[in-house]
């Protein structure tokens, strides 16, 4: 991933960027496989009404793979002779940290936008 600024849309952060941020953080925490990532996200955000779908989570993971940030490894599933599980690990941790840094700037901007809307209208 190049050292370039993430371009802002001028409004709120896109869902895919939001999910990619969480994929990176959960990989740092070694929550390593897709379905587990999906379960954790759904559990974490259930209370506030955000339920990421399977397709968006996997698209986010695949973008991180395409960007060279994550890589997949296949391991045999414990207790199963022929089944494999796909795990995600960092391929380029520096690029992952850069992405998080860029998203932090964007999320701070979005927070200010939302706070202004709440202040101005309620």
Curated annotation (Swiss-Prot):
Keywords of the record: DNA-binding
Keyword DNA-binding included in the entry's annotation: yes
A Pfam family of this chain: RTP
GO molecular function: DNA binding
A biological process term (GO) from this entry: DNA replication termination
Job of this protein: Plays a role in DNA replication and termination (fork arrest mechanism). Two dimers of rtp bind to the two inverted repeat regions (IRI and IRII) present in the termination site. The binding of each dimer is centered on an 8 bp direct repeat.
This protein's name: Replication termination protein
Taxonomic placement: Bacteria, Bacillati, Bacillota, Bacilli, Bacillales
């Amino acid at each position: 991933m190049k050292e370039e600024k993430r371009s802002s849309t001028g409004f709120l952060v896109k869902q895919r960027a939001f999910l990619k941020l969480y994929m990176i953080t959960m990989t740092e925490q070694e929550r390593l496989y897709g379905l587990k990532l999906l379960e954790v996200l759904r559990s974490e955000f259930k209370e506030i009404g955000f339920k990421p779908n399977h397709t968006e989570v996997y698209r986010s993971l695949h973008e991180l793979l395409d960007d060279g940030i994550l890589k997949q490894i296949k391991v045999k599933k414990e207790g199963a002779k022929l089944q494999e599980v796909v795990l995600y690990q960092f391929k380029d941790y520096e690029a992952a940290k850069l992405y998080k840094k860029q998203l932090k700037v964007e999320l701070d901007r979005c927070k200010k936008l939302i706070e202004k809307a709440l202040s101005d209208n309620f």
